[in-house]
Amino acid sequence: MKATVNIQDQFLNQLRKESIPVTVFLLNGFQLRGQVKGFDNFTVIVETEGRQQLVYKHAISTFAPQKNVQLKNEAEV
């Protein structure tokens, strides 16, 4: 049986593990620049200048990392 690949979780986990700087665009146009410190099914913790913010995923439009994120292919999962 194949395991389901969750691209969102892989992407956010790589941002977190590699401490990749990211710009988070919210639906209201606001931008957060920082690092992903953690996430769950509904929220993401973004740290900016030593301060953490809990952001609900439904308020997020886009994650724009400063470098490409390497995702595992299906054979590696």
Swiss-Prot record:
GO MF terms, alphabetically ordered: RNA binding
UniProtKB keywords: RNA-binding, Stress response
Superkingdom: Bacteria
Classification via PROSITE patterns: SM
GO CC field: cytosol
One Pfam short name: Hfq
Quaternary structure, from the entry: Homohexamer.
Family from the record: Belongs to the Hfq family.
Function: RNA chaperone that binds small regulatory RNA (sRNAs) and mRNAs to facilitate mRNA translational regulation in response to envelope stress, environmental stress and changes in metabolite concentrations. Also binds with high specificity to tRNAs.
Protein name, UniProt field: RNA-binding protein Hfq
Source organism per UniProt: Shouchella clausii (strain KSM-K16)
Upper classification of the organism: Bacteria, Bacillati, Bacillota, Bacilli, Bacillales
Name of the encoding gene: hfq
